[in-house]
């Protein structure tokens, strides 16, 4: 009897342990599987509206943005839900609809991809227009070159052929080329013309310096201290990057000074 009671007690404890172990495991597994497998299905009325639209537009089942908004209002769904439904419907429902009509589904998918090509061409055309923007941005620099040519022409007249060659140099170079290396991107014919433009200011400056030497020799040794500034050798031809306005001011001041010195020499005589 004792052994039977002990066996009964042990068996009862084992069943209790099994119940306590099984219950939480079953609940957790069922709860976890319920959370994982649960899917929110759309309302039947909304799905029917979307199916009707898909069947009417089965040969081109790609709604526009306005049509998506209209369908979202009719079905009381968000536009994201409408887009996702059409993405899945084109893969699952649309091929069967087309096969019932005796059509090949692959033909309509290919035709849709073909219609997307104009969008790529639009992108290429927009990129092409961007490539022309630097040429339009170079136009503000043309007045600066015009003023530079005016200063060169004011110091000494230049032939009209060399003056007209200056805009061609700007057209064949970029803004960075004018700042860094203006001669590397120019045409071979234009390089010689640019050197012709550089030569007249140097000649004009040497002519003015010679006149200053003659005035200084006429005035005598007393004026050597004042004319010492003009005994320097002629400078090298300036680059295109230099500003000629400073040279123009120096020439004007020097001419005025020379005129004053000539008046003083005449008065002393």
Curated annotation (Swiss-Prot):
GO terms for cellular component: nucleus. PROSITE patterns: HOMEOBOX_2. Residues 35-97 bind DNA. It is found in: Nucleus. The keyword Iron-sulfur does not apply. Its main location: nucleus. Residues 1-41, 213-236 are annotated as: Disordered. GO terms for biological process: negative regulation of DNA-templated transcription; negative regulation of transcription by RNA polymerase II. The keyword Transmembrane does not apply. Keywords: DNA-binding, Homeobox, Nucleus, Repressor, Transcription, Transcription regulation. Binds to the F' element of the APOVLDLII gene and represses its transcription. Belongs to the TALE/TGIF homeobox family. This is Homeobox protein AKR. It comes from Gallus gallus (Chicken).
